[in-house]
Swiss-Prot record:
Native organism taxonomy: Bacteria, Pseudomonadati, Pseudomonadota, Betaproteobacteria, Burkholderiales
Binding site for substrate: N264, G321, I322, M323
Gene3D superfamilies linked: ATP-grasp fold, A domain, ATP-grasp fold, B domain, Succinyl-CoA synthetase domains
Positions bound to ATP: K46, G53, R54, G55, E99, A102, E107
Protein name: Succinate--CoA ligase [ADP-forming] subunit beta
Length: 386
């Protein structure tokens, strides 16, 4: 789960990480009032969306008067902000963050993220913070340093010093930088985050180190014990189909193709999408119904897939382990009738009660195309949507 920058800064503030003063705004008038309350003389008007690259996309502007704040807020609020992370369709800006202007002398990058390979927390830092960190990672990876923190030990003073030295933090700011790293680590652990990123981390002309941005991702599996984090969720920033799917415990992710996929198991779902692409098709979604799918869940899955106007065909690929094939067959038949299915449907089932499931589909009277292998299923659905 992601949150907005201003929400992330509130969390950092709670853990003692220095951040500039700022006030969220939902209207142009609120933006003006926020600027007046902060007092200026320079403000930053920031679009609040769940994507990076806002500055390059025109979503972060400096204002030097209240009139500037009003004009920029009117320009940014409601715009369709396109960044390298939103895709070409962009994301509508519904919230702003009005923040004190900063004395920027040197920008750094700092983040901590779960590293599953080492089963540790990776601290990543760079002397080249700001809007072009992706380009730094691509062109000059030697400017990015990584250390791994054992969660049983925590971030040590020596590791903090290693980070400071690695990014060339001046001596008069090193102690403050290490303190921020330790507080960031505690924040990361205590909030069950999977990513906390500060980009940029600014050092001003007086040697003060301040977080000018905040990006958080939280482990969805831990949200049950973090109601205060769940309360920060902004459904407007999420795909409506994914939000709807989550209500029925369906793992759904929208893609750009035209072949809907309904599969049980994440691994099989990814393999199914790969196979569709191998045979010249493009999947329209990832959809894992899990091991406890009911006919009702299958019906809802069909409804969600078919809300996407790009879907021209559906492939159902089921391995009957925990999930019984006859249960899926019942769900498929029920779903086809409930949605009055008008697009080609290919079903491949293997495993528990396989023959019974196939028999039910064959006797349903519905134009369901059967397949025995993944390759056959992919070939048939790709041909059917041509």
């Amino acid at each position: 789960m992601k949150i907005h920058e201003y929400q992330g800064k509130d969390i950092l503030r709670q853990f003692g990480v220095p951040v500039p003063r700022g006030i969220p705004a939902f209207t142009v008038q609120e933006a003006v009032e926020a600027a007046q309350k902060l007092g200026g003389p320079v403000w930053v008007v920031k679009a609040q969306i769940h994507a990076g690259g806002r500055g390059k996309g025109g979503g972060v502007k400096v204002a030097k008067s209240i009139d500037d704040v009003k004009a920029l807020a009117g320009q940014i609020l409601g715009m369709q902000l396109v960044t390298h992370q939103t895709g070409p369709e962009g994301q509508k800006v519904r919230r702003l963050y009005i923040e004190d202007g900063a004395d920027i002398q040197k920008e750094y990058y700092l983040s901590c993220v779960t590293d599953r390979g080492t089963q540790k927390v990776a601290f990543i830092a760079s002397s080249e913070g700001g809007m072009d960190i992706e380009e730094v990672a691509h062109s000059t990876p030697e400017k990015i340093i990584t250390i791994f923190v054992d969660p049983l030990v925590g971030l040590t003073q020596a590791q903090g010093e290693e980070l400071a030295k690695g990014i060339g933090m001046p001596a008069d700011s090193t102690a403050q930088f290490i303190d921020i790293c330790q507080k960031l680590y505690k924040c990361y652990m205590d909030t069950d985050a999977s990513l906390v990123e500060i980009n940029p981390l600014n050092r001003d002309s007086k040697g003060n180190v301040v977080a000018l941005d905040a990006k958080f991702n939280f482990d969805a599996n831990a949200l049950f014990r973090l109601p205060e984090i769940v309360a920060l969720r902004d459904l407007d920033e999420e795909d409506p189909a994914e939000v709807e799917a989550s209500k029925f415990d369906l793992a759904y992710i929208s893609l750009d193709g035209n072949i809907g996929c309904l599969v049980n198991g994440a691994g099989l779902a990814m393999a199914t999408m790969d196979t569709i692409k191998l045979f010249g098709g493009e999947p329209a979604n990832f959809l894992d119904v899990g091991g406890g799918a009911t006919p009702e869940k299958v019906t809802e899955a069909f409804k969600i897939m078919l809300k996407n106007p790009k879907v021209e065909g559906i492939l159902v690929n089921i391995f009957g382990g925990i999930m019984k094939c006859d249960t899926i067959a019942t769900g498929v038949i029920t779903a086809c009738k409930a949605v009055n299915l008008q697009v080609p449907l290919v079903v491949r089932m293997k495993g528990t009660n396989e023959e019974l499931g196939k028999k039910m589909l064959a006797e349903s009277g519905l134009p369901i195309i059967s397949a025995d292998t993944m390759a056959e299923a992919a070939t048939k659905i790709v041909e059917a949507v041509k």
